[in-house]
UniProtKB/Swiss-Prot annotation:
A single cellular component GO annotation: cytoplasm
Gene name, Swiss-Prot/TrEMBL: rimM
Domain remark text: The PRC barrel domain binds ribosomal protein uS19.
Cited PANTHER family: RIBOSOME MATURATION FACTOR RIMM
PRC barrel domain ranges (all copies): 96-175
Intrachain disulfide bonds: none
Location(s) in or outside the cell: Cytoplasm
Native source organism of the sequence: Baumannia cicadellinicola subsp. Homalodisca coagulata
InterPro entries assigned to the protein according to its UniProt record, in alphabetical order: PRC_barrel-like_sf (IPR011033), PRC_RimM (IPR056792), RimM (IPR011961), RimM_N (IPR002676), RimM_N_sf (IPR036976), Transl_B-barrel_sf (IPR009000)
Complex and partners: Binds ribosomal protein uS19.
NCBIfam families listed in its UniProt record: 16S_RimM (TIGR02273)
Keyword Metal-binding: no
Name of protein: Ribosome maturation factor RimM
Biological role stated in the UniProt entry: An accessory protein needed during the final step in the assembly of 30S ribosomal subunit, possibly for assembly of the head region. Essential for efficient processing of 16S rRNA. May be needed both before and after RbfA during the maturation of 16S rRNA. It has affinity for free ribosomal 30S subunits but not for 70S ribosomes.
Amino acid sequence: MPVNPVVLGTISSAYGISGWLNIISFTQNAASIFEYQPWFIKKLNTWLDVILDEWKYNYHNKLIIKINSIENREAAQLFANCNIIVDASQLPTLSDGDYYWKDLIGCQVETINSYQLGKVIDLIETGSNDVMVVQANQQHSTKINELLIPFIYGQVIKNVDLATHIIKVDWDPEF
C-alpha cells in the first residue's frame, strides 16, 4: 500500500477477450508510466498490488496492459475506471524551480502585496507554459469563480513555498 499515493494513470476499459486492459497514462511521455513500479489499485476500499505481465501499443497506438491472473474480458472489466497509483517516493527528485503538479494543487495563491487570490485546484498544459486554475476566494466570488494564471516563473510566479503551501504571484487581482 502506498504511503503517499500519486495517480499516474487510469485503467479505462477491457481490451479484447483475453484479459487485456486499455490504460490512459498521465505521464508526459505515455510509456514512462512503466518506469514506476510497483503499481497499486484501490478497489472497494482495498489496496491491490498490480503485477504487470506485459504491455504494448494496440493497433490504434494506445497503451494496453496484461495484469497477472486476469485471463478473460469479464475479469478485466472489474478493473475498468480504476486509477493506477504509485508511491510518491518513486518519483524522481526535481531540480530547483521545477514542481510536480500534485504539490501545487491545494496551495494558496497570493499577490506580491499579500492579496489572497484563492487556491490552486488544477493545472492546464497549454504547450507554451502551464496555467494554474485558481478557485477564487470569497472576495472574488461575486465576480469570478476561477482565475487562470500562467505558471511563468520569474515573470508571474515570484515564489513557491511548498512548506507553507503559498505561491506568490505578480498578478492584478482585477484581471
